[in-house]
């Protein structure tokens, strides 16, 4: 477990404004008088661009090599970067402009903010299709057992989606 913690701490050092690193969970162990033969570390990396993926991979490789050598342990890496970064490109900026104007016309303040989150939209954007996320209902505490939605936001968000789709249909393209 302590070796997994060493890996977690070293991986966290890769954090930067362009790379989010979350050593989220260490599993393993048992009675406190037994040295476990296995520990599993789960880490989430969220890169802002493809260059950060390469930097993260290099940091992972260097961390694994350093901790394995220093502590005489075997470390295996599983998984990878399965959601490419989703930067705001020209198409996404045009789409956001349509959404923002639709919001203004409905009396809604629509603002863009980078959350660093990932979703299926990352895969769609990687195919060159413009994506704007989180147009759904308002709420909070996302991804927790306290997650909630504000019921009054259902009609406003339906109207926002409908007006956005109408405007795109009227233009015939983005």
Can you name each region flagged by the protein language model?
Residues 1-174:
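Metal-dependent amide/peptide-bond hydrolase catalytic core
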